[in-house]
A protein has these predicted regions:
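Auxiliary alpha/beta "docking" domains used to position bulky ligands
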Residues: 2-114, 158
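Iron-sulfur cluster-binding cysteine motifs and their immediate structural context
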Residues: 120-143, 149-150, 160-162, 166-184
Length: 218
């Protein structure tokens, strides 16, 4: 399944802002939220079919989530290596409910849609981490660096302190995607009111109280 997650900061920050946080990290931990949603769905299915067995996963099993989503007709892999959906763009969160029963029918991959000749995500990446083969160079990706405990110092972070939405914020599908409608995905605070100095003076326990992120050490 996919869950749209675009919020008011998904379209980007002011150019001179120096404490940017990826929009997904501004919310409550989506792993727990989506797993709870899948659990509720499984409960309804079990009410109709008591013998049904299954298990929910959200980044918690070695499943090729993006490829499964493509095969299910939910979207395609964009140039920035993320799943892109026709309605919600790439600001979506993935979860799976694996069951021991066959379905009456299965969806097929989408046809006639994709990124075409668009290269906005490639051009938007401040470090050139978006490759031409729908892959990311993790050595140059700001998001990869800032979610590690000891981020490398050899790349400029362009004001990002956790994650990076640069390649997504320029995507035409994302620009016209609607904002999410579920309160569980609302930002827990306004990062624009937090200057870099406030984050630098903050203990880890306090940062976790604002969101589920853990700021990397320097």
């Amino acid at each position: 399944c996919i869950r749209d997650s675009k919020n008011g900061l998904s379209d980007g920050y002011p150019d001179d802002f120096r404490a940017k946080i990826a929009s997904y990290a501004l919310t409550a931990d989506y792993h727990a939220t989506i797993k709870g949603m899948l659990g509720d769905l499984f409960g309804r299915l079990r009410a109709a079919e008591p013998a049904l067995a299954g298990r929910a996963f959200v980044d918690s099993a070695p499943l090729v989530e993006k490829q499964l989503a493509v095969e299910a007709g939910l979207g395609w892999i964009g140039r920035q290596s993320l799943l892109v959906t026709p309605r919600f763009g790439s600001f979506v969160l993935l979860g799976e409910l694996v069951l021991d029963a066959a379905c009456d029918r299965y969806d097929e991959p989408l046809a006639g849609v994709g990124c075409g000749s668009c290269r906005r995500c490639v051009e938007a990446c401040p470090t050139g981490a978006v490759c031409n083969d729908r892959a990311i160079d993790a050595r140059r990706c700001i998001s990869c660096h800032t979610i590690e405990r000891t981020p490398a110092a050899e790349i400029a972070l362009d004001g990002w302190i956790f994650g990076c939405d640069a390649c997504q914020s320029r995507c035409p599908y994302n620009l016209r995607a609607p904002l999410h409608l579920h309160p569980a995905f609302d930002p827990l605070f306004d990062p624009l009111s937090f200057p870099p100095e406030r984050w630098l003076a903050m203990e880890e326990a306090e940062s976790v109280s604002y969101t589920h992120l853990t700021l990397p050490t320097t």
